Amino acid sequence: MVKKVLLINGPNLNLLGTREPEKYGTTSLKDIEQAGRDQADSKKDGSELQVFQSNTEGFIVDRIHKAKQDGVGFIVINAGAYTHTSVAIRDALLGTAIPFIEVHITNVHQREPFRHQSYLSDKAVAVVCGLGVYGYTASIEYALNY
């Protein structure tokens, strides 16, 4: 079982709770992160959830690289808009060879056509989308038991 899971959130996800609540709900990113930490702590086996958010692509790439050094065993990533544009994030994930789940709050396939393309999905262990913030809970649970 994985002991260290890294939750990465990309651009604009720091605005959760106030950004387009009709699409993304009213739960803040801080609340999602705390719920995930509590979820890991409840395992009572030393499991740990590390969290990271950045609006900057290069900082996300750097954090993925650091995850390998930190002994992270699984990544849960909502790359936000970078999902549809970032070869750099894809290559960082592949370069570290850390298994990952791609998560999205909304069902990206019910949205604009440009959101239907993901640079991550074909390499992800799983893709979770459209479950609201519960998608994080499900993804973290899977990662902790991987």
Curated annotation (Swiss-Prot):
GO biological processes: 3,4-dihydroxybenzoate biosynthetic process; quinate catabolic process
Gene3D superfamilies linked to this entry: Dehydroquinase, class II
What's the Enzyme Commission number for this chain?
4.2.1.10
User: Which keywords describe this protein according to UniProt?
Assistant: Lyase, Quinate metabolism
What CDD domains does this protein's entry cite? DHQase_II
**What's a Gene Ontology MF term here?**
3-dehydroquinate dehydratase activity
Q: Does the keyword tRNA-binding apply?
A: no
Q: Which residues bind substrate?
A: N78, H84, D91, I105, T106, R115
Entry-linked InterPro entries: DHquinase_II, DHquinase_II_CS, DHquinase_II_sf
Pathway-wise, it operates in: Aromatic compound metabolism; 3,4-dihydroxybenzoate biosynthesis; 3,4-dihydroxybenzoate from 3-dehydroquinate: step 1/2
Q: Which SUPFAM superfamilies match?
A: Type II 3-dehydroquinate dehydratase
Which residues are named in the active-site annotation? Y24, H104
In the UniProt record, does the keyword Lyase occur? Answer: yes
Q: Which residues form the signal peptide?
A: none
Q: Where is this site: Transition state stabilizer?
A: R19
Known catalysed reaction(s)? 3-dehydroquinate = 3-dehydroshikimate + H2O
Please state which protein family the record places this protein in: Belongs to the type-II 3-dehydroquinase family.
Report quaternary structure and partners: Homododecamer. Adopts a ring-like structure, composed of an arrangement of two hexameric rings stacked on top of one another.
| Function comment | Is involved in the catabolism of quinate. Allows the utilization of quinate as carbon source via the beta-ketoadipate pathway.
- NCBIfam families registered for this protein in UniProt: aroQ (TIGR01088), PRK05395.1-1 (NF003804), PRK05395.1-2 (NF003805), PRK05395.1-3 (NF003806), PRK05395.1-4 (NF003807)
State the protein's name.
Catabolic 3-dehydroquinase
